[in-house]
Amino acid sequence: MAAGPISERNQDATVYVGGLDEKVSEPLLWELFLQAGPVVNTHMPKDRVTGQHQGYGFVEFLSEEDADYAIKIMNMIKLYGKPIRVNKASAHNKNLDVGANIFIGNLDPEIDEKLLYDTFSAFGVILQTPKIMRDPDTGNSKGYAFINFASFDASDAAIEAMNGQYLCNRPITVSYAFKKDSKGERHGSAAERLLAAQNPLSQADRPHQLFADAPPPPSAPNPVVSSLGSGLPPPGMPPPGSFPPPVPPPGALPPGIPPAMPPPPMPPGAGGHGPPAAGTPGAGHPGHGHSHPHPFPPGGMPHPGMSQMQLAHHGPHGLGHPHAGPPGSGGQPPPRPPPGMPHPGPPPMGMPPRGPPFGSPMGHPGPMPPHGMRGPPPLMPPHGYTGPPRPPPYGYQRGPLPPPRPTPRPPVPPRGPLRGPLPQ
């Protein structure tokens, strides 16, 4: 248990233990700190007259990492009802002491060293356990304490943040403490700050910043940047948060799509009998009497590879020749539908008008607007609704109604002979 000379100790692996009760012995101190790591030796200075220890001791560990771990887990724990102070040896603390000592006044009597350590350790490294001045007879707090920080940055932050704050329902006062060797001069002078800046040990143990690595507050999302480099949405697209544009009328182009340019005029005799009419197949391919196959298959649906500009050029009706000229004017007559398909002409007299051809959308004879620019979907009839009653076929004449069939009556039973008067 007995320690060797101080010069033979590993000061970096030795911790100072203060605030020990008189019942604490070296074997108990050995077993207590053995939980933090392997202990080399323990030493508790004793009074030569009484033979009792003076309330503090030293514990040497096998490595410096074990000593640092013991300081973290053993500091301010209670032993026999008293919180013990565990930190590095005093020789090491003297090298780190730069004079950043603060005074804390108007403390509540219930505040102990543990509460002060937990409160002020958020601002930086504390070299020694906070010292609360107590009455030697009763042990009650006198209402003020001292804290020694490892840097002036930590002490400045503690004074700025905690001065005037409430701690246990009392506003505390935090300022630099007075120096012991001079009257009326406080710590934190320019000379002390200059010496602290030149101390390499104090620069190695910089105080930690609790909220220095906090993420920045979330900012507003940036608008969509188009290919033009501005914050406006692309042409034809509604701005964020607005309603979709209305559905364009049949035959009209959706907003934002430029109209198709008319084809250049053809010289006479370049592929037909006279200049072709607008919209004919020969208008876009001079020198050919017959153009390429129709861009739309029978049924009115365009090819998947066609763009919106080609749809606008070929017309809104889904046919390859929307504006064919009359016979004899140089244009070609409209093509006849394949067998089995209804003729696009007017219906016979008395018949209801035909609906749109198979494959074309209801109510939209023109090209469909591009995806993302359509309006709300059309209202659909409720489930089970069959529509109004159909009219009778054309030429049907209802004849006179047949007479109602007589309902047979049940036979009446024959009546018997009349009875005479009842006997008296």
From Swiss-Prot:
Record keywords, A-Z: Acetylation, mRNA processing, mRNA splicing, Nucleus, Phosphoprotein, Repeat, RNA-binding, Spliceosome
Molecular function as annotated in GO: RNA binding; splicing factor binding
Residue ranges, annotated region (Disordered): 207-424
Gene3D superfamilies documented for this protein: 3.30.70.330
Biased amino acid composition, Pro residues: 232-268, 332-381, 388-424
Entries under InterPro entries matching the protein: Nucleotide-bd_a/b_plait_sf, RBD_domain_sf, RRM_dom, SF3B4_RRM1, SF3B4_RRM2, SF3B4_spliceosome_assoc
BP GO annotations: mRNA splicing, via spliceosome
GO cellular component terms listed in the entry, alphabetical order: nucleus; precatalytic spliceosome; spliceosomal complex; U12-type spliceosomal complex; U2 snRNP; U2-type precatalytic spliceosome; U2-type spliceosomal complex
Positions where Phosphotyrosine occurs in the chain: 56
Annotated positions of the N-acetylalanine modification: 2
Domain of life: Eukaryota
Residue ranges of domain RRM in the record: 13-91, 100-179
PROSITE patterns in UniProt: RRM
Compartment annotation: Nucleus
Role: Component of the 17S U2 SnRNP complex of the spliceosome, a large ribonucleoprotein complex that removes introns from transcribed pre-mRNAs. The 17S U2 SnRNP complex (1) directly participates in early spliceosome assembly and (2) mediates recognition of the intron branch site during pre-mRNA splicing by promoting the selection of the pre-mRNA branch-site adenosine, the nucleophile for the first step of splicing.
Subunit structure comment from the entry: Component of the 17S U2 SnRNP complex, a ribonucleoprotein complex that contains small nuclear RNA (snRNA) U2 and a number of specific proteins. Part of the SF3B subcomplex of the 17S U2 SnRNP complex. SF3B associates with the splicing subcomplex SF3A and a 12S RNA unit to form the U2 small nuclear ribonucleoproteins complex (U2 snRNP). SF3B4 has been found in complex spliceosome 'B' and 'C' as well. Component of the minor (U12-type spliceosome) spliceosome. Found in a complex with PRMT9, SF3B2 and SF3B4.
Membership in a protein family: Belongs to the SF3B4 family.
Protein name: Splicing factor 3B subunit 4
Organism, as annotated: Rattus norvegicus (Rat)
Gene: Sf3b4
